[in-house]
Amino acid sequence: MHDKILILDFGSQVTQLIARRVREAHVYCEIHPNDVSDEFIREFAPKGIILSGSHASTYEDHDLRAPQAVWELGVPVLGICYGMFTMVVQQGGEVEASAHREFGYAEVRAHGHTRLLQGIEDFSTPEGHGMLKVWMSHGDKVTKLPPGFKLMASTPSCPIAGMADESRGYYAVQFHPEVTHTVQGRALLERFVLEIAKAQPDWVMKDHVAEAVAAIRAQVGDEEVILGLSGGVDSSVAAALIHRAIGDRLTCVFVDHGLLRLNEGDMVMEMFAGKLHAKVVRVDAAELFMNELAGVADPEAKRKIIGRLFVDVFKAEAAKLKASGAGHRGATFLAQGTIYPDVIESGGAKTKKATTIKSHHNVGGLPEQLGLKLLEPLRDLFKDEVRELGVALGLPHDMVYRHPFPGPGLGVRILGEVKKDYADLLRRADAIFIEELRNTVDPASGKTWYELTSQAFAVFLPVKSVGVMGDGRTYDYVVALRAVQTSDFMTADWAELPYALLKRTSGRIINEVRGINRVTYDVSSKPPATIEWE
């Protein structure tokens, strides 16, 4: 049994990042809504509790509080932003609206040499005060500390930016240590989890394989599973894990919807049917998908159509397999490679408190009438954990560390209406971009630019531009190249690729892909932009 950290979610969009940071310290944690019962908290038996931020206001939303058991367990508690405010109020302090709201970068002064912050700083002032570079996002302020608490941190506009009652192990900070913009955030959270809560760092993926296999066997029993195999990292790792657990009772359905990357179908079949000896059924549904997507330009509508068609294809394929009598009794589970970031962006976290940004293919495309139970063995894992799990399962490094690919495929990388001709052009342009990234080494790091970017792809723009090739005028389509660097896919910076790489890629695309005469590069970060264009 692993030591556990309980994260109570009050509705912050970045609550999952807290979990990621705790997992990076190799400590198991779970996120649950702030209004879970006292009994649940006692049975969970956490080594420590973290209270998340929220978009709500403490003094206006009187129902958004931590359960009383949080304060009765006798374990360390860390409040973050709103979590600090509710700790203040519930422990007898006071909070009010601030005339000086703080959103963004701030420099926090540490006070009192508490266990949480001692020795953790970014720089010192001439007076010798330890300073932290942090990320703030709050409109309230603490005006009175609760009994037993002392000041731990401050800024000029926020006199109480951190507090501590070390006798009870209660700590709270106004800033967000979970985001990468807080430079020492990881060190702070590790200090709380490992040294203050004293949780054992025994959460590692190579050991998780046996636990995940046991969990799948317990959930599935002697029933059968059908899985949509896309060739992406998530579905591939999910397939390998489930196959390890139940063998031939897993049937992978590889749906070629005409929106895959170049030669992807053949590569998927070679790996899973050829090398892993898994049962894989390849379904050519390109014409069906293209017909249904004709005339549809809205991104959400496209996602819903693709999700619905996947369901229809799965149901039809399951019926065919059952009728064939080929040792298949009929699947009762549908497996998916859903991971934490998928759940976050579709507003489908366990807490149901986050705001929907876009529907996710895995989540939004499954209507209740599917008739299959859902198996999501990766749902609580972050991308880096999924990759580590894939390596532990013996999947090839190149497959496991391949860049993410969206469930709807090129359907959300073709802006507006999806057409076969557009997909053919985009496939070839994208393949050239990826090839150049793989072949270009950064001298400083010794790594390829494919390794240095977290996700890279081409986007098809349904507009034409004038060009000149030879002595003739061209009027052809435009593609945009997108490459980002991120540690968590919650936020991302555009990758500053070498000009020579971009020049070479642009030249190859324009010369080798007839129908494209202009290439642009996307220099938008997330936020405000999302990583995918649709």
UniProtKB/Swiss-Prot annotation:
Its EC number is 6.3.5.2. ATP binds at residues 230-236. One of its GO terms (molecular function) is ATP binding. It catalyses: XMP + L-glutamine + ATP + H2O = GMP + L-glutamate + AMP + diphosphate + 2 H(+). Residues 4-202 form the Glutamine amidotransferase type-1 domain. It comes from the Bacteria. Residues 203-402 form the GMPS ATP-PPase domain. Keywords: ATP-binding, Glutamine amidotransferase, GMP biosynthesis, Ligase, Nucleotide-binding, Purine biosynthesis. It is an enzyme of class 6 (ligase). Homodimer. HAMAP family: GMP_synthase (MF_00344). Catalyzes the synthesis of GMP from XMP. This is GMP synthase [glutamine-hydrolyzing]. It comes from Methylibium petroleiphilum (strain ATCC BAA-1232 / LMG 22953 / PM1).
